[in-house]
Amino acid sequence: MMIFFQTNPTTIFVFLISLILSSHYSEVDAETEFSYIEGSGTGPEDWGQFGPLCGNGTMQSPIDIQHVQVSPTLGELQRHYKPAPAVLVNSGHDIAVEWRQDAGKITINGTDYQLRECHWHSPSEHTFNGTRYDLEIHVVHQSSSGKFAVVGIVYKFGRPDPFLARLYNQIRNIGSGEERNLGIINPEDIMFDSKEYYRYKGSLTTPPCSENVTWTILKKVKTVSTIQVKALREALDEGNESNARPTQDTNGRLVQLYCPRRNGGST
């Protein structure tokens, strides 16, 4: 059964205007993204609007690593990487290398996590007894069940990082929202040259801040040049140049330290 309404030019005009306004505000809402700008309404203190766990989670990351339990039984990090095609992506809030084919995996407690991407934060997100370093890379892996395993490496200013050196020109010339083909990238070029690492359970450090992440933070501090960090910062959207989330409460979580030649205990 069809019902017909009587219309006139004024009614049609009002209807069209309402459609246009509705469409406009829908697009604005969809495009609203989180930022790192304090007081902007979209900064870290307001991320709860993008994911409830960002505001009320109890296992959030990053953290300040202080007291740890030495756990030699954790074993060395099991990496099984291989070269694969990758692209450089500028999201506006970070620069990432995304592998578009199988680039290998890491294995933790018998679970395989496939390598997805790596990205950078400056300054570092994790701190160590209150010390914050100049840069941190997150190498992100995901299991078949959707859980994450992220390997973090922190850097201080010094000699250039070889992996960033290879990407330097592309980083300098990539705009926000763009991606660039990188060809074949070997994940081992990141150089995971530390057997000692910290391990704890936490979250993604950006919305939705999901609390399904096994964190592995390498203990060794590497070096990066000031111009490399400058390139990473200048490529991002205005206000996001410093893209480190403040440290979160540990809420009594256990932080383990793997040292190959040390007995167990707390430090």
Regions found by a protein language model. Give the residues of each.
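Alpha-carbonic anhydrase
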Residues: 2-267
